[in-house]
């Protein structure tokens, strides 16, 4: 699969997004050269992905020039520049056309393999008969101080954020995709003026067939990705030890991450089985040293891991592979991005299990297999465990499926309703008992009237019918009183 950056690279300056002033300056420069007015070479500078190399090739195509290019993956010492650039700068091409020489990333000249490169470039430029365009990311590096006086500096600058969405939209439509405008804006703003990076992001995200807004939000850090793409390209293309090892010097990535990138892209670059086998062999040896670094905390082994990973991989190929290769982020990163929500949910479940079982998250994982079986086979026990671990409906659904989750929470809801009804009934009974007790405290107790039998009733009636007996009793009372009085008188 061809890399979209190369597939849709503009063939004409008119197709280059933005850079209106830069394009005008380049056209004026090369037209003056064609008219016979010799011009200084142009040093086109700007951040990575701003289109410097693209504009150099586009202007050559517009004005029918052949191109000879030396980039960061090539050896660019004094002898090479003298032989390749020096010859091309003063002669016509085999086709009879004029030649445009492109020296890409001259600010990357470093190491033993590039020794004397800058001084030789200055020497060649003085005698050049053909136009020369140099590109650089950081034109103010001390190593380029002498070169700046020999060239005309043209600022490419970064691509304006508003110029990126139309390009992405056009590429997506040509590839048969319709993308939400919000996603395109997210990718564009994330690129930070780096059109190449934006196109790489678009292609990486569309590898899965579609893009969601969350995928665009979870794009990796732009600076790191920009550096890693450049580093991988250098490692894969070069056959020189120093160039390969220097590719990761300023890289803001761990070696483990670089290893994943190389592993992902090695089969795309190395088409010969022997080269591929050697490359993976060196990569595995690098991984062994990385493991020793982490286990023993001996970081002196780090340089061996780095050398095996970069130079080992680069020198595994018999010959340099020409042409463009589509490099992409490791699929493991894409999968991790897409499973982020699921992993967070699983982590929350394991936390709840760990709290109840007094184990770590790692230890709680061992209970998951049992939970899966229980939730699938025993609904009542699954309900009890859900209540015990305080799982939410979404968490139970994550462990099982929607149907089981629905059944479990239906049971829980029924039990809650039953408990509520029982509680209300008990409350009602308690209120009634309390009311009776309070009523008894307020009202006095009325003694019950004794029951009267039929015989007692007849006796009462008989007494009422014989008044003589009452008279006799009444007449007897004074006698007893007088006797008592007489008795008392004796004491006085």
From Swiss-Prot:
Extent of Basic and acidic residues compositional bias: 461-482
SMART domains: AAA
Pfam families: AAA, RCF1-5-like_lid
Region (Disordered), start-end ranges: 445-492
Keyword set, alphabetical order: ATP-binding, DNA replication, Nucleotide-binding
GO biological process, one term: DNA replication
Gene3D superfamilies in the record: 1.10.8.60, P-loop containing nucleotide triphosphate hydrolases
Binding site residues for ATP: 46-53
GO molecular function: ATP binding; ATP hydrolysis activity; DNA clamp loader activity
Family, as annotated: Belongs to the activator 1 small subunits family. RfcL subfamily.
Purpose of the protein: Part of the RFC clamp loader complex which loads the PCNA sliding clamp onto DNA.
NCBIfam families on file: PRK04195.1-5, PRK04195.1-6
PANTHER family (UniProt xref): CHROMOSOME TRANSMISSION FIDELITY FACTOR 18 (PTHR23389), REPLICATION FACTOR C SUBUNIT 1 (PTHR23389:SF6)
Oligomeric form and interacting partners: Heteromultimer composed of small subunits (RfcS) and large subunits (RfcL).
Protein name per UniProt: Replication factor C large subunit
Annotated organism of origin: Methanococcus vannielii (strain ATCC 35089 / DSM 1224 / JCM 13029 / OCM 148 / SB)
């Amino acid at each position: 699969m061809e890399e979209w950056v190369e597939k849709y690279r503009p063939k004409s300056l008119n197709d280059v997004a933005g850079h209106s002033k830069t394009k005008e300056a380049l056209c004026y420069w090369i037209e003056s050269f064609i008219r016979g007015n010799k011009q200084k070479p142009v040093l086109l500078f700007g951040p990575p992905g701003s289109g410097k190399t693209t504009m150099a090739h586009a202007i050559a195509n517009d004005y029918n020039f052949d191109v000879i290019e030396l980039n960061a993956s090539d050896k660019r010492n004094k002898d090479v520049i003298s032989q390749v650039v020096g010859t091309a700068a003063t002669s016509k091409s085999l086709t009879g056309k004029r030649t445009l020489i492109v020296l890409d990333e001259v600010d990357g000249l470093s190491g033993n393999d590039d020794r004397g490169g800058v001084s030789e470039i200055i020497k060649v430029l003085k005698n050049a008969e053909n136009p020369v365009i140099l590109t650089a990311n950081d034109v103010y590096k001390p190593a380029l101080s002498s070169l700046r006086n020999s060239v005309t500096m043209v600022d490419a600058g970064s691509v304006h954020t508003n110029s990126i969405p139309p390009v992405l939209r056009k590429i997506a439509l040509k590839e048969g995709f319709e993308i939400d405008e919000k996603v395109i804006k997210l990718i564009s703003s994330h690129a930070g003026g780096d059109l190449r990076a934006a196109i790489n992001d678009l292609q990486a995200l569309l590898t899965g067939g579609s893009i969601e807004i969350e995928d665009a939000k979870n794009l990796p850090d732009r600076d790191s990705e920009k550096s890693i793409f450049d580093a991988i390209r250098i490692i894969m293309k070069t056959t020189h030890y120093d160039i390969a090892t220097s590719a990761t010097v300023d890289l803001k990535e761990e070696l483990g991450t670089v290893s994943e990138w190389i592993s992902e892209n090695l089969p795309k670059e190395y088409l010969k089985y022997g080269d591929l086998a050697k490359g993976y062999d060196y990569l595995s040896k690098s991984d062994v040293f990385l493991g020793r670094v982490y286990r023993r905390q001996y970081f002196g082994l780090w340089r061996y891991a780095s050398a095996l990973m970069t130079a080992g991989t680069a020198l595994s190929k018999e010959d340099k592979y020409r042409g463009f290769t589509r490099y992409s982020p490791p699929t493991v990163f894409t999968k991790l991005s897409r499973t982020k929500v699921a992993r967070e949910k699983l982590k929350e479940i394991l936390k709840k299990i760990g709290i109840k079982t007094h184990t770590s998250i790692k230890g709680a994982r061992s209970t998951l297999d049992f939970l899966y079986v229980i939730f699938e086979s025993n609904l009542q026990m699954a309900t009890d465990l859900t209540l015990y671990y305080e799982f939410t409906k979404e968490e139970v659904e994550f462990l099982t499926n929607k149907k089981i989750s629905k059944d479990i929470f239906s049971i829980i809801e029924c039990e809650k309703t039953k408990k509520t009804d029982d509680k209300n009934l008990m409350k009602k009974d308690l209120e009634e008992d309390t009311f009776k007790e309070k009523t008894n405290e307020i009202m006095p107790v009325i003694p019950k009237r004794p029951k009267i039998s039929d015989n007692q009733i007849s006796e009462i009636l008989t007494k009422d019918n014989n008044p003589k007996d009452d008279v006799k009793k009444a007449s007897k009372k004074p006698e007893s009183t007088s006797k008592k009085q007489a008795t008392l008188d004796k004491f006085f």
